[in-house]
Each structure stands twice: as structure tokens, then as C-alpha cells.
Amino acid sequence: SCAVFDETGGLVANAPHIPVHLGSMSDSVREIIRQRGASLRDGDVYMLNAPHAGGTHLPDITVIAPVIFDGETAPAFFTAARGHHADVGGVTPGSMPPDSRRIEDEGVLLQDVLLVREGRLLEPEVRALFEAGPHPARDVDRNIADLKAQIAAVVRGAAELKRLVAHYGRTGVQAYMRHVQDNAEEQIRRVIARLKPGQFETPMDIGAFIKVAVKPDPAERRVTIDFTGTSAQADNNFNAPLAITRAATLYVFRTLVDDNIPLNEGCLKPLKLKIPERSMI
């Protein structure tokens, strides 16, 4: 999954293949912004897979590149690519054990890792990370090869954004990015105006429940999606991080729009999510 983000980490456009990736990648980009701040440099690339930082499960590694123009220090855009690696360690090959109870059971946890420094892959350091921990990756050469492909994607994306700006100007490009997001927001608001309130409940195989109440406000053209009553965090791997809940909600509302709009940050603006603390979602 590849995507372009604005300077705040807001999703602008993407290749619409895996919605749960695309709806959660903004949280990963924003984690890098929070952790790195003013130290972000053009030519650097970062990676992470931490579920509490916008990740999904550990085999999905997100590679992120800031796009910084000459003479400037702050990123104007970000590009990112999330890919599923065949194995990142864990107690079973493939890093998806059915009986995992702790995050380290699923493999190597990566958060805010510098992958490329000013165009140079930090391969020894990256190998050391994948080979560390109680359950290291089983084929680090393959991980490195996959990461090189992801790096190529984000670097090419950054180059294309710079070419776009050189041709049309920064002001015009950023204005159209905002327009794309604003248009998506307006389309979702039109959907909300037609929604009726409802309550739904889904039982899980483990005896837990996911509960959701949809509470539209037609006058404000906003909607509250309230997950109050959902079961508490389980002592197994049936839990989902917050970013995944946001991504699933975003995708549902995108499917209610008939027009051909990209999935982006604008789709989320009219939505208010209420998610209980320490719940399974």
C-alpha cells in the first residue's frame, strides 16, 4: 500500500488496495513527526510496525519518507509504503501465531527506526534489529530485500512530488491537495444527512461483543460512532489497536459515497469516534 500525505500527516491520496492499511497509515506518519520533529531530513527514511503507532500486525512494516525542499527544514509532504513481510520473527513462522498473548510472540517490534540516513541504507543496524529479541526474524535477507523495494517506492514518490511542484508550483499543488480532502469531506457530509440512527452488536467466537451506535446529526452534518459497551481488552490476539478501528470506520463511510473520490483525511473530519478505554478495539 502506497500513499501521499500532507505536512501534518493527513492522508491525501493512495493506491486503494488494502483499506485497513490506508486508513491507519496517517497515525504512523504522525508518530514519526512526533518522535523526530525538527530532526527530520530530506533523504532520510524511517520504518515502524508498532500497533500503538498506527501499525496493524507486526508483519506489516511501514516505510516513511519526509519530502523537504532545498533551503527548508520542515517537510512539505510525506510518502509512505506499507508492506506485509513473510516473517518478522515470533513463536511461529509467518509471525501470525494463533495463540499469541504478548506482542513479542508475533515478532520484532519496530518503532521510529531510522532506515536510511541521507540516502544511505543503514543495513548493519537494521539487520541487528531483526536478529534481536527472544524470537528474531527467520530470513533477514528477505526482509532487507523487501525494505529496499519499499524504500524505492517512497523515494520515487518523493521525487515525483518534487517534480510536480517544480512544474505547477508549491501553492497550486498544496491547494489541490486541500481541495481533494475538502471534496471528500463534503461527500461524507452529504451521506450523513441521509443516515438514520441505529445500534448494532456483533458476537465474537471468544464470547466477546463489539457494540456500536451510529448517531447522525443531520443539522450539523456530523455523526458520532459510539462503541460504548464493547468488551474489554482480551487476554489473547483478538484485540485491535485504535488506528485499525479508525481505518475500518473510515472505509465503511467511504463505501457509502457513490462518486469516485480517493480515500483520504477529509473522509474522517465529519466523524466522531467514541471508543472505550481498555476495550478490545
Residues covered by each model-derived region:
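A glycine-rich phosphate-binding loop feature that marks nucleotide/adenosyl-phosphate handling sites
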Residues: S1-V4, V45, N49-H52, R170-T171, ...
